[in-house]
UniProtKB/Swiss-Prot annotation:
It is found in: Cytoplasm. SMART domains: AAA. GO terms for cellular component: cytosol. This is Protein RecA. ATP binds at G66, P67, E68, S69, S70, G71, K72, T73. It comes from Methylobacillus flagellatus (strain ATCC 51484 / DSM 6875 / VKM B-1610 / KT).
Amino acid sequence: MDENRSKALAAALSQIEKQFGKGSIMRMGDTDVAADIQAVSTGSLGLDIALGIGGLPRGRIVEIYGPESSGKTTLTLSVIAQMQKLGGTAAFIDAEHALDPVYAQKLGVNVSDLLISQPDTGEQALEIADMLVRSGSVDVVVVDSVAALTPKAEIEGEMGDSHMGLQARLMSQALRKLTANIKRTNTLVIFINQIRMKIGVMFGNPETTTGGNALKFYASVRLDIRRTGAIKKGDEVTGSETRVKVVKNKVAPPFKQAEFDILYGEGISREGEIIELGVNLKLIEKAGAWYSYKGEKIGQGKDNAREFLREHPEIANEIDAKIREHSNLANAAMTTAPDEESDE
């Protein structure tokens, strides 16, 4: 670039910084620009790997959607528990008025420190979310769910009134306001969403999410969570097999998926994932029904192997660290492993 042009550019940059504040414009190569996106673990080792950065990205919007009872709230509560382990503050905006504090506690959430709001209208919910984000002192904000964000006009109107597009307009306006603040304060904002069926779709997928298209565009990560089967002990159902697909990912390659078990009353089975991923990476040997680690048998059948790892957290942490190292998530292992050791 010739001298005159570089002087003109320097003057323009100086003017922008003077008018809009330091850091409002910078070169991508500057050392001040954070190249690494900070991530919050999801509590699922397989999903952290599928996301490519070791968890959900901070300073971004994330959408988690799926059918009823697929594990959407369980996954978000697990993220909250991981954030609290790192000393972060979490807020849960419960538009569905359905959060069970006892269940949240079982998943490792410190309920006494969790900020909770049960708003009356969609406008109120999104305004509260925006105020929490702008405060800069909340690390993760969860909105449960987009489908329950009812516009004020609909609540105050008659039962049969038509309110086409109101919710979509509300979401579009709120996300325009939220996005810049989320990035500036490095807050992770998670929207839980439900699935609806499009009428008259002959070809392609008839499923769609509620609240219009704005969230699809503004979300950096979109996760599709599904229940694929039941976990049984005899005739009793003790949990559900779950698959999560990374439908959109702006921070790493998308379309990866993770499978894990959600045990009722416990949440995501960390030990179950360690066994599955350990076998896939040949860190754990499987011969018939027996599982072995370093030549030593750890259990016959997955349930017994899971119980062994639960009783020996140091072995579980060792395999966990090896899996993360193999998947280039060594940094994420450093933030979670010590906490889990101290919890035992």
